[in-house]
């Protein structure tokens, strides 16, 4: 059976996902077969495996760092909030049903067998399984029948390392307080703590570390510095939405929808020379930009209503009149059409809502979800404005409940030629007659370096700017970032001690 290690945190966003990613790469570098595992993930940022199954993006990133293909076994339960009160429950990569919190808590104990089966599947096929907890193990109102923190650690008999975020302030109190709220059996399972996101002189920190060890009777296994690494984040709890950039040569505005999903779609754009990204948050104006992107969302009708309530629809139409480029991805693509219908109330109580009217499509939210790894061809139907995109193949993935239908003489954006390794021929997306508005269901399209370069060069040419010769290969860039992350974390942690802890639990 594999070695096991579980990373838990004092709160959400303390760095659990990133540390698990780093450990996966470290163990890979050490010649071990390693797999990540998170029993239950709540996130709108998801990923589609090559079998067409949906998991949390964090586990896909961790698998990539481990050098293996993502699998539904790594994240058997995915919760995708669709409103303030309900979440879509995805089990082993497939939609189960929408549930309220109360309904899910009653249902949750039935999932233990499924969780154990998937963990054992990984443990039998790997040398190490690195487990990620969720939120905090000290949420005392949720501890009963826990399946994601200490309950999971006990189920699979894994040692726990507790992570605290010093950048937030109060790290000693958060670690000591967490330990206080654990029962004796749970405290005994915590084998050490990690201080994350440290800035400054570590010598000043050392006396505090010694005092903390005396208080909690656990060793500090390392202090990880604040890291500026470019690796996909798990969910929307991120600073990216509130970072304001100076004006660039090409300014791209992205609307931060209330239920934004797969926001990592736009990370490759941040690596394109001369491109500046700004997120338009609730209550803010779009302002001037060269490209406006409306991203994916878990609640298209609800988010479109919010967009209209804040008057952003008028700003979008104004940008259209100015000849700016407007791009929609998945739910954002649906919003650009004439109408969105939800006859089965999958996402909303509203059966129908008028769209922005910028593309000749009608969307119907269906009961069945399309999930696939996708390859598509950008054909001759594209207008001359986008002529440099003609003939390109792009890869990405689809996750959508809706189906969109071209109206009248409207034109599609691409032809899907492959889904989950099977040959198909399916029309995707839509494009306006002048090519300045287009939408697609394909997430990850900007990870295609040639597509991104050609599209940005179209904008640059219109502004009289020199075209880019090349843009960074984002997939190669990610690989280098995994190695850089692993080197920082390896040099910050007592890896010899961590190996000893894992070996000790192998025999328990």
UniProtKB/Swiss-Prot annotation:
SUPFAM superfamilies: Class I glutamine amidotransferase-like, P-loop containing nucleoside triphosphate hydrolases. Keywords: Cobalamin biosynthesis, Glutamine amidotransferase. Pathway: Cofactor biosynthesis; adenosylcobalamin biosynthesis. GO terms for molecular function: ABC-type vitamin B12 transporter activity; catalytic activity. InterPro entries: Class_I_gatase-like, CobQ/CobB/MinD/ParA_Nub-bd_dom, CobQ_GATase1, CobQ_N, CobQ_synth, GATase_3, P-loop_NTPase. Residues 249-451 form the GATase cobBQ-type domain. The active site is at 330 (nucleophile), 443. Pfam families: CbiA, GATase_3. GO terms for biological process: cobalamin biosynthetic process. Belongs to the CobB/CobQ family. CobQ subfamily. NCBIfam families: cobQ, PRK00784.1. Catalyzes amidations at positions B, D, E, and G on adenosylcobyrinic A,C-diamide. NH(2) groups are provided by glutamine, and one molecule of ATP is hydrogenolyzed for each amidation. This is Cobyric acid synthase. It comes from Caldanaerobacter subterraneus subsp. tengcongensis (strain DSM 15242 / JCM 11007 / NBRC 100824 / MB4) (Thermoanaerobacter tengcongensis). The lineage of its organism: Bacteria, Bacillati, Bacillota, Clostridia, Thermoanaerobacterales.
């Amino acid at each position: 059976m594999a070695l096991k290690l579980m990373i838990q945190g004092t709160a959400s966003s303390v760095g659990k996902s990133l540390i698990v990613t780093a450990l996966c790469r470290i163990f890979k570098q050490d010649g071990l077969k390693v797999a990540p595992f998170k029993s239950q993930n709540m996130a709108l940022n998801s990923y589609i495996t090559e079998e067409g199954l949906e998991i949390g993006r964090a586990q896909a990133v961790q698998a990539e760092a481990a050098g293996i293909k993502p699998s539904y076994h790594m994240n058997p339960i995915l919760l995708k909030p669709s409103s303030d009160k309900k979440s879509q429950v995805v089990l082993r990569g497939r939609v189960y049903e929408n549930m309220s919190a109360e309904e899910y808590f009653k249902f949750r104990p039935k999932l233990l067998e499924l969780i154990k089966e998937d963990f054992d599947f990984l443990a039998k096929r790997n040398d190490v399984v690195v487990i990620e907890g969720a939120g905090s193990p000290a949420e005392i109102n949720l501890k009963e029948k826990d399946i994601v923190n200490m309950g999971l650690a006990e189920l699979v008999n894994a040692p726990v390392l507790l992570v605290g975020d010093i950048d937030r302030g109060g790290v000693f109190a958060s670690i000591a307080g967490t330990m206080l709220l654990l029962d004796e059996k749970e405290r005994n399972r915590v084998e050490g703590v990690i201080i994350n996101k440290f800035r400054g002189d570590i010598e000043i920190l050392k006396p505090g570390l010694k005092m903390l060890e005396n208080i909690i009777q656990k060793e500090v296994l390392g202090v990880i510095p604040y890291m500026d690494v470019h690796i996909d984040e798990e969910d929307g709890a991120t600073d990216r939405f509130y970072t304001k950039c100076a004006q660039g040569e090409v300014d791209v505005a992205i609307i931060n929808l209330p239920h934004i999903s797969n926001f990592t779609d736009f990370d490759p754009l941040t690596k394109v020379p001369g491109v500046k990204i700004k997120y338009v948050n609730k209550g803010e104006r779009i302002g001037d930009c060269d490209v406006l992107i409306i991203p994916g969302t878990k609640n298209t009708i609800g988010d479109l209503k919010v967009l209209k309530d804040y008057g952003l629809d008028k700003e979008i139409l104004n940008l259209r009149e100015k000849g700016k480029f407007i791009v929609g991805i998945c739910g954002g693509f649906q919003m650009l059409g004439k109408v969105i219908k939800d006859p089965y109330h999958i996402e909303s109580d509203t059966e129908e809502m008028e769209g922005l009217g910028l593309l000749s499509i009608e969307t119907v939210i269906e009961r069945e979800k399309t999930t696939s790894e996708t390859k598509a061809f950008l054909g001759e139907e594209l207008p001359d404005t986008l002529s440099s995109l003609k003939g390109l193949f792009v890869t990405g993935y689809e996750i959508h409940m809706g189906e969109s239908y071209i109206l009248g003489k409207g034109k599609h954006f691409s032809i899907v030629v492959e889904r989950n390794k099977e040959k198909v021929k399916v029309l995707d997306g839509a494009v306006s007659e002048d090519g300045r508005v287009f939408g697609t269901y394909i997430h990850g399209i900007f990870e295609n370096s040639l597509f991104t370069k050609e599209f940005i060069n179209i904008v640059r040419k219109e502004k009289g700017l020199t075209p880019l010769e090349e843009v960074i290969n984002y997939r190669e860039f990610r690989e280098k970032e995994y190695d850089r992350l692993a080197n920082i974390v390896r040099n910050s942690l007592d890896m010899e001690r961590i190996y000893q802890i894992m070996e000790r639990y192998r025999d328990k």
